[in-house]
Amino acid sequence: MRVLSAIALVASLVPSALSAPASESRVSTQLQSRDAAGYSSPPYYPAPNGGWLSSWADAYEKAQRVVRNMTLAEKVNLTTGTGIFMGPCVGQTGSALRFGIPNLCLQDSPLGVRNSDHNTAFPAGITVGATFDKDLMYARGVELGEEFRGKGINVFLGPSVGPIGRKPRGGRNWEGFGADPSLQAIGGAQTIKGIQSRGVIATIKHYIGNEQEMYRMSNIGQRAYSSNIDDRTLHELYLWPFAEGIRAGVGAVMTAYNEVNSSACSQNSKLLNEILKDELGFQGFVMTDWLGQYGGVSSALAGLDMAMPGDGAIPLLGNAYWGSELSHSILNGSVPVSRLNDMVTRIVATWYKMGQDGDFPLPNFSSNTQDATGPLYPGALFSPSGVVNQYVNVQADHNITARAIARDAITLLKNDDNILPLKRNDSLKVFGTDAGPNPDGLNSCADMGCNKGVLTMGWGSGTSRLPYLVTPQEAIANISSNAAFFITDNFPSNVAVSSGDVAVVFISADSGENYITVEGNPGDRTSAGLNAWHNGDKLVKDAAAKFSKVVVVVHTVGPILMEEWIDLPSVKAVLVAHLPGQEAGWSLTDVLFGDYSPSGHLPYTIPRAESDYPSSVGLLSQPIVQIQDTHTEGLYIDYRHFLKSSITPRYPFGHGLSYTTFSFSQPTLSVRTALDSAYPPTRPPKGPTPTYPTTIPNPSEVAWPKNFDRIWRYLYPYLDDPAGAAKNSSKTYPYPAGYTTVPKPAPRAGGAEGGNPALFDVAFAVSVTVTNTGTRPGRAVAQLYVELPDSLGETPSRQLRQFAKTKTLAPGASETLTMEFTRKDISVWDVVVQDWKAPVRGEGVKIWLGESVLDMRAVCEVGGACRVI
């Protein structure tokens, strides 16, 4: 039954996939690079080799010694997944057991081990972003790394920094950290450092421009949409968090399903070879998203290193673009041996870099079943069976961090008459199914593909099973003996109202990944729009008509419209609890009843109307014809657009109230590095890279081993007629336009992980003293925005570049926060010079400090003075 369900799921993926060519080693892909409405992805070949940075030298030396002695089959094995549902993890490579390299296990999700057991369901990325707390971002990464390692997972498929949140209705915005490149960059980098500190390879995704779910994948009748992005916008907005993730040493990058400038991300040589591997100096390996490979030779030449889960675009019969086809392409010369050597060296070097050649456990769980025993290869019709789940408990005390994140993310938008915090003896009437449990049971919806009970996370591959869930209903009942609960989305007609009652109304808004449609929403928020689900707006209005004191609690994936009820006199307070994970109830009551003061801040803007956004960020839907999603708004998404257009939102980016108040004083600005030139100093030269023989291997290296027991649909590197494959000539292969094997000169903007190391010289430091001027303890967030001079051309008037959060300050207590920012932080991308340009000596730069993008408390001018506003 488990096998049949797995096959059925595979079959369901077929309509959203391209037909695989009969022999990709000799047939050009359908998705070559070409112009779209003036946007293009110029070819960039060959793929740069990894290993030229000193920080990776030891790992590459070890990898070189191993790869030099590998057979062709062993090399191909490590670059190709074994097939969908063909192992315990959502993806696994083949192995090279002669060298101690096992099948590498790759597993979702960014908030916890997906489809597993005895794991922590942490708050989602958007919740982490709302904390504006770097320490919590890092701590979550550490504990995720511990749990993934404990389950025997080599590669953690996260964090997600794309989508960036360009489209407020976008289905997967909640997996990332917020609608700003610096917030995404800091959240992503801190997560990566934490995960990899535990020896697990992190994967930054989805590279790049995957800003809506609908039409993201190519299928038989329609190509995936093309995100058409100009060079400056790409660098300053969408690439920014990826660059910081690479600077943090991330081991893997996952490509997006969509195209960029009419070239599929998984075979876009401009994105992979030039920008990622050359300009940004990425030393790890590039993998596809699942079934996001659209060609074999073309993707290898364009810089792809690993195909996941290995299958071709129709994952039914065990066909693949790589696997045996890659062996074929090497033997006939279509793919140079040097390219395969670099592919596998990058993978093995990353394995060594994380120390996984030591005491690293094998997978002890199955993402295919919760049963103790079952098929070892569920995607095969006939599979050997055995123990697949050992139920290893990896939770430790991680619930403490999960609760702290969920609590510190809670964002107080409104608190008229200081109605919050509630008193324990207040008479409470609690409304809304979002306060209660899922009536069908915990984890009853696969990949959280429903919105029933309290909303803890969105849906899709970015989820994990809940080990337990404390609902708001349970937590409130545990604290208050004077609370009545109405777990319904229709306001009851028979509710008795007393003069001292406080109505607490729970509403939610959900979204997720495109392969699941929930209540008419195919991932993106199409049906519900930006409104609350389940009659939420009416529920608030009905409560406000009956009660004089209403508190609204919102669990949401992103911006939510509030105009129908936010100004009603009875609506006294609004809390956004985001997506809290397993500690939904306890984290909320910590704040609701005043044990902690709220310290979260909005990681996006809440508009007054959806029409406040630029029209270009709406969802696009067009059957059959390829969608051209042209980013005409350029750099101006979210708060940048609102500032440029002088639109006052309902609540601005960064907004968040407290139960206390804070003052900012004594701002100072100090110079750390003199910026004597507009462009960074000359980049350091590339170091040497591993070298190997480039002779085409003996065909016998991919012959089937004798007496080999094949598993149907398992993807192997072997060929039935390897000698025949070697006879084919590469001259007939239609290489992409611009293809060459002659290396390009090193780009001037490169030189290290993330780019020219001079870009990350600390240019200035700003300090400010924050004082608790209220009557309750609390934590404050100082947000640093830069305003660049007109000499650099048109730029957003304010751009978040740093933030810092105080410790808990008692009334009257102070803390001095210091924030550093780099040359790159005050630079723009020069599309002509192809480098980052800053104002000489930082002249004309203003640094704004505040508690939101519209609540500035101090300003400093480079070359001038600082003052309190």
From Swiss-Prot:
One family name in Pfam for this protein: Glyco_hydro_3
Active site: D289
Reactions accelerated catalytically: Hydrolysis of terminal, non-reducing beta-D-glucosyl residues with release of beta-D-glucose
An example Gene Ontology CC term for this record: extracellular region
Location(s) in or outside the cell: Secreted
Region (Disordered): 678-698
Record-linked SUPFAM superfamilies: (Trans)glycosidases (SSF51445), Beta-D-glucan exohydrolase, C-terminal domain (SSF52279)
The EC number(s) this enzyme carries: 3.2.1.21
Pathway: Glycan metabolism; cellulose degradation
Composition bias, Pro residues: 681-691
Listed InterPro entries: Cellulose_deg_GH3, Fn3-like, Glyco_hydro_3_AS, Glyco_hydro_3_C, Glyco_hydro_3_C_sf, Glyco_hydro_3_N, Glyco_hydro_3_N_sf, Glycoside_hydrolase_SF
GO biological process: cellulose catabolic process
PROSITE patterns according to UniProt: GLYCOSYL_HYDROL_F3
Cleaved signal peptide residues: 1-19
Entry keywords, A to Z: Carbohydrate metabolism, Cellulose degradation, Glycoprotein, Glycosidase, Hydrolase, Polysaccharide degradation, Secreted, Signal
Listed GO MF terms: beta-glucosidase activity
Glycosylated residues, chain numbering: N69, N77, N261, N332, N364, N399, N425, N478, N728
Family stated for the protein in its record: Belongs to the glycosyl hydrolase 3 family.
UniProt function note: Beta-glucosidases are one of a number of cellulolytic enzymes involved in the degradation of cellulosic biomass. Catalyzes the last step releasing glucose from the inhibitory cellobiose.
Protein name: Probable beta-glucosidase F
The organism of origin for this protein: Neosartorya fischeri (strain ATCC 1020 / DSM 3700 / CBS 544.65 / FGSC A1164 / JCM 1740 / NRRL 181 / WB 181)
Upper classification of the organism: Eukaryota, Fungi, Dikarya, Ascomycota, Pezizomycotina
